[in-house]
UniProtKB/Swiss-Prot annotation:
One Gene Ontology term of the molecular function aspect: tRNA binding
Gene designation per UniProt: rplP
Protein name: Large ribosomal subunit protein uL16
Keyword Cytoplasm: no
Family membership: Belongs to the universal ribosomal protein uL16 family.
Organism encoding this protein: Bdellovibrio bacteriovorus (strain ATCC 15356 / DSM 50701 / NCIMB 9529 / HD100)
SUPFAM superfamilies given in the database record: Ribosomal protein L16p/L10e
NCBIfam families membership: rplP_bact
InterPro entries named among the record's database cross-references: Ribosomal_uL16, Ribosomal_uL16_bact-type, Ribosomal_uL16_CS, Ribosomal_uL16_dom, Ribosomal_uL16_sf
Keywords: Ribonucleoprotein, Ribosomal protein, RNA-binding, rRNA-binding, tRNA-binding
Subunit structure: Part of the 50S ribosomal subunit.
Task of the protein: Binds 23S rRNA and is also seen to make contacts with the A and possibly P site tRNAs.
Length: 135
């Protein structure tokens, strides 16, 4: 799973995802992309599942770029623990995704192959996405 090698602070505030993506909203590397339409949190497991779905769909052809990285720790207290006694331990890593953010990009495949691969990946993600093509 993807996670930062080291972080300055072990635990972070929850925070909220508001507004639209300004950076990372355009295709920079490939000819085809998968863009988020809704906001949400993307876990490292979901990101990896989407990447595997794309790579299995296109087999050995094409190049894939992953444009998001899970850099926010999510904490969780153990089951059946009384309230209080501080914040829980880091459980998983998530990426905060805003509407308009490009999640994956692909190059070296046909439009139909890219569309099918991104549809398979979209089923693994917790929010709505759309297919982008470079003009």
């Amino acid at each position: 799973m993807l996670s930062p090698k080291r972080v300055k602070w072990r635990k972070q505030f929850v925070g909220r995802a508001t507004g639209f993506a300004v950076r990372g909203a355009n295709l920079d590397f490939g000819d085809y992309g998968l863009q988020a339409v809704e906001e949400g949190r993307l876990t490292a497991r979901q990101l990896e599942a989407g990447r595997i779905a794309i790579s299995r769909s296109v087999k050995r052809g094409g190049k894939i770029w992953c444009r998001v990285f899970p850099n926010i720790p999510v904490t969780k207290k153990p089951a059946e623990t009384r309230m209080g006694s501080g914040k829980g331990n880091p459980e998983l890593w998530v990426a905060r995704v805003l509407p308009g953010k490009v999640l994956f990009e692909m190059n070296g495949v046909t439009r139909e192959q890219a569309k099918e691969a991104f549809e398979r990946a979209a089923h693994k993600l917790p929010f709505k996405t759309r297919f982008l093509v470079r003009e």
